[in-house]
Each structure stands twice: as C-alpha cells, then as structure tokens.
Amino acid sequence: MHVNTLSVLSLVGLVPLAAARLSGSVGPLTSASAKAATKTCNVLDYGAAADKTTDLGAPLASAFADCKTGGLVYVPPGDYALESWAQLSGGKAWALQIDGTIYRTGTDGGNMIFIEHSSDFELFSSTSSGAMQGLGYEFHKDDNWSGPRLLRLYDVSDFALHDFILVDSPSFHLSLDTCSNGEVYNMAIRGGNHGALDGVDVWSTNIWIHDVEVTNKDECVTVKSPAQNILVENIYCNWSGGCGMGSLGADTNISDITYRNVYTWNSNQMMLIKSNGGSGTVSNVVLENFIGHGNAYSLDIDSAWSSMSTQSGDGVEFSNFTIRNWKGTEANGAERGPVKIICPNGAPCYEMYIEDFAMWTEEGDEQWYTCQSAFGSGFCLQSGSDYSSYEATTSTATSAPSGYSAPTMASDLTRDFGSTVSIPIPTIPTSFYPGATPYSALMGAQSSASANVRAVAFGTSAVVSRAGSSSRPAQTGSFLTKSTTAAAGSIMGPTAAAVQGVCAPPAGQGRGAARYGGHRRHGHRH
C-alpha cells in the first residue's frame, strides 16, 4: 500500500473536494496487460535495432499499424535513433511501452512522436527510465529555436502518460491538444535554459497532471485556451520558467482550473497569467499551496504583457479566483513584488480572493503589491461590486509577514543546463512537493513487490500482476474506480515482471483503487 503523506504546511487551507475540478474519470479504459494479451508488437520484429543508428520511424509505424486496434507496441531497452517522425493516428485500445531511449537524429520540424485521433491509450515506461532525447542543443547552438517538438497528443481520449522522461527538445516537450479524460504523472522533463522550450502545454478537457518535474526556462505546466476541468498538482518547477496560463488572445475560454502543491525554485515566476488585449473569459480558478524560492515573480496576472502583440478586444475577463496558502521568498521584492494583478480596464477582474499569502524578499528589506482594475479581497484588491476600472495602485511592505518561511527541496538545482551543450537524461524524482508523496509509486520501483500477485499470460512468458482492488465506500467528491475489475500488472517485456502498488488518493479524498495494466482508471465526482 502506497500512502500519501503531507506536511502540515501543505495541509493548510485545502479546498473542499468539489474544487478539485475534474469532471469525470481519467485514464485508459482497459489495462496494458489486457492490451498486451490481445497482441504485442515488438519493434525489433519490424526492423528496429537498438544500435542508435537504424531509424526507428518506420518500424514504430509498422508495429503500430498491427496493434492499433488493440494491442501493445513495445520498444525494449536500448538506444534507438529516430530520423523520420512517427505519426500514429486512429488507434483504439492500444498502449505504447517505451523502455529504451529514443535519440533524435532527424532534422525536420513538426513532432517526433505525434499521437492523434486515439482512445483508450497509454504511453509509459515499465522501468521508469524510458526517454526521448531531443539533442536540442544541436539546434540551439546555432540560435535555431524552431526545431521539432518531442511528443504531441491531439484528439486523444481516455489516456495516460506516465513514468517517462523527455529531455532537451529542440522546441516544446509535451503538448496535449484537444484531448480529454487524461492523466499525466511521474515524469521528468529537462530542457535548455531558454524560452520557447515549453515543458507541458495543455489545452484540453478533464485532465489530471500530477507529480511532474520540469527544468527549462519557459513554461513549466501551462494551461492554454480552450481548457476546462484541469487539475494540476504536485509540480516541481526546478529552475524553470514557472507555471502559467496563456498567452491568451481572442475568444479565450478557460474554466474550472486548479493548481495546488506547486513548488517553484529559481524560476521566472510561480504563476503568470498573460494576455494583452483579447476577449473571452477565465473563471473558477484555484491556485493553492504554492511554495517558491528565488523566483523573479511570484503571483503575476498581467493583462498588458509586453512580450505579445496587442490583440483585438477589450481584454480577457478574469473572475472567481481563489489564491490560497502561498509561502516562501522572491528574489527581489523591491524590483518585482510578490503580488501583481494588472487587469484590463475594459474588462476588470472580479471575485478575486487572496488568503493566507505570506512571502518575503531575499534581497533588500521591502516589497510591493500592485493591482489595477481588480476587485475582491486581499492586499491591493479593491472591494465593491461596481467593477469600474481604476489605475494601478501600489502598496509597500517594509517588514516580513509572519509565517512566510517554507521548506526547500533536496534536489533543487544549483545551476542551469545552458542551451548549447548536451543535457544529461535525469531520473524521475520520488518527491515533487515538500512533504507530499506521489500518488503512484514509480513503476520501476515496484518490480520487487511481492504481495497479492498472480501470473497473467504474456505470450510464452508470465507477467506478475496485482489482483483486484482495495475500496472504500463511494463518497461525493471522492475518486472512484470505473469500468474494470481487472488484475493489475505492468508489462515489463517478454521475460520480466512487475507488480503494481495502490496509489494514494488526493489529500482528504477516499478512492477505490482497482489497479491494472500499469495504470488505473480514476473516477472523480463532485
């Protein structure tokens, strides 16, 4: 049993369960073990070679073609070259298990692996060490920032992506485009120290992203438009750009978003919501349990963001924001204060609430808070309900607030990785927020477990699986299992075996935990 524990700090001010924002179940509908039992397509049988030279593109596409209607595509341990990109379209009830490392050798734009129009899908590494190495520095040293993305999912439903590593993309690392009912977790993303190298970008519906570490100098985990019912938690922005929303332009449509348990170290910001003109709305947002150290900005809602051109419209309207339990320090509060809420004069923000927010400057002895056309409570936010525009107001603090002290993480980086030399492949951490245990143990750490197992046929060998489920009575606002009582088992390759442990629910939430196939389908009600 894998038990979730949270520090006293991270328990402060947790929102009601209904605020978790997911609208329904997330994850694949059938297990990876069931998919593998239907059919297994090993890329080595289609011409691939783990020699870091032979192009994996065609063998991967051929293996997918044979397993796309039900099966598991398997990339065994080893080093593979990818010269021609893989566009994998139209899959149903399939999985992609990458236990090897895929090195970019091609130079085209686009997406190295592009998965689209698929359902009931899972991408994972059973060893938690499978990776894509984009070798982006080969582009970046020539000041070229428009190379390929590593991994993009488009129009994919009921899916999971986990226990996988993305390194040094020439461009963005992971994009979730118009997807639904998905879960992303237990990942490490490490990019160059430069803009335009986004970690995770999501514009989708009903997505749970948790237990992810990002190193780069642009987006950590960022929500773009349109997006609804996104839950982002246990995020480690370790020398990154930081989390955010945007850039937001015309017809913005974002609602029911929660970020919680976000730790940000030496980054551009803890949270940046950026727009410049535009139209539409961002509503029903919770930003809670944020810890930051050494960041340039902390809370930055900027409707006049100068790094984007002005869009047509009176501005994006922000409403019903709860910002709760922020602790830590910013780099220099006199230069960049911890609270900056600049709303459009043509579309003032309203119902903006800041609670239990205590941060202090690392340099100097003062910091400022500034608001413009923003209504609610806390710091410089104005009260009232007429929501008339007003010019920016600034207040200055010259003494530290009580309770601002916050822990650091042992894995906080002491330097960046630059952008012109090769970046090493990291291991996935086992902690992403101080005092919080990941909801699911790493698959690679579970292979030695021995309780409650049974063998499941896998070709001529056996895969060890966790049988059945643990359960609690269903409660409103709890996570529930859905659509399966199958045995749980990760696919470790033709001769290996693994056991899946039971993951812990989000803090304060009971959840039945039928586990299967390296993953489980979560139901969330509120």
Curated annotation (Swiss-Prot):
Glycan attachment positions: N144, N238, N253, N320
Catalytic activity, reaction form: Endohydrolysis of alpha-D-GalA-(1->2)-alpha-L-Rha glycosidic bond in the rhamnogalacturonan I backbone with initial inversion of anomeric configuration releasing oligosaccharides with beta-D-GalA at the reducing end
EC code(s) of this entry: 3.2.1.171
Keyword Cell wall biogenesis/degradation: yes
Residues spanning the signal sequence: 1-20
MF terms in GO: polygalacturonase activity; rhamnogalacturonan alpha-L-rhamnopyranosyl-(1->4)-alpha-D-galactopyranosyluronide lyase activity
Catalytic residue list: D218 (proton donor), H293
S-S pairs: C41-C67, C220-C237, C343-C349, C371-C380
Keywords carried by this UniProt record: Carbohydrate metabolism, Cell wall biogenesis/degradation, Disulfide bond, Glycoprotein, Glycosidase, Hydrolase, Polysaccharide degradation, Secreted, Signal
Lineage top rank: taxon: Eukaryota
One Pfam family recorded for the sequence: Glyco_hydro_28
A GO cellular component annotation in the UniProt record: extracellular region
InterPro entries reported in the protein's UniProt record: Glyco_hydro_28, Pectin_lyas_fold, Pectin_lyase_fold/virulence
GO BP terms in the entry: cell wall organization; pectin catabolic process
Subcellular location: Secreted
UniProt function note: Pectinolytic enzymes consist of four classes of enzymes: pectine lyase, polygalacturonase, pectin methylesterase and rhamnogalacturonase. Hydrolyzes alpha-D-galacturonopyranosyl-(1,2)-alpha-L-rhamnopyranosyl linkages in the backbone of the hairy regions of pectins.
Similarity comment: family membership: Belongs to the glycosyl hydrolase 28 family.
Name used for this protein in its record: Probable rhamnogalacturonase B
Organism field: Aspergillus terreus (strain NIH 2624 / FGSC A1156)
Gene this chain is encoded by: rhgB
